[in-house]
Amino acid sequence: MSKRVLILTGDAVEALEVFYPYYRCLEEDIQCTIASPVKKKLQTVVHDFLPEMETFTEKTGYKIDSHASVDEVDPADYDGLIIPGGRAPEYIRMNTKVQEIAAHFLKENKPLGVICHGQLVLTTVRKYLQDREVTAYPACRPEVEAAGAVFVEQTLHVDRNLVTGQAWPDLPKFMKEFFNVLKKAEKVNS
């Protein structure tokens, strides 16, 4: 049976952090569903790092369809979850169904990949984040630590079922580790 991965996001998602995982999943013959608070064509954004800037820049990116609203999603139907960054996590984390989906993957120890600002979603399900080691975009560190997680100063970190990355330049290693965790989970559940 084919594996199924859910990507949980919304408008202002970092373009690379949604497109790269989506197409990598398809390349691996994994069914991949993009879900957002409202099923629609999502507007992505492009973040870049310029030497003269103290923070990243943001420009309008491509659009991508979400396949389902979060209200249509049963997390039990999915083998893995990816939460991309960008600004989408700032507002989708307030959606109770988004919180339920994130909690399901942490509680059930199912493969979960979270990159950049995506960790902001996890801060809403603190009881499952306690003492978990994560990395994130460095500006998210105070919120991640306030939620009880241990911030690790690495560009990529794996804590059991949880794969975390700092930013889009880490996507190749991030997806490699996410697929490793997905394969291990498949062996355990076989």
Give the label of every model feature segment.
Residues 136:
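Short, basic/aromatic beta-hairpin or loop at an interaction surface
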Residues 115-118:
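Short, thiol/selenol-centered motifs that function as redox-active sites or metal-ligating centers
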Residues 1-108, 120-133, 141-190:
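Extended, subdomain-level signal for the structured scaffold at the beginning of enzyme domains
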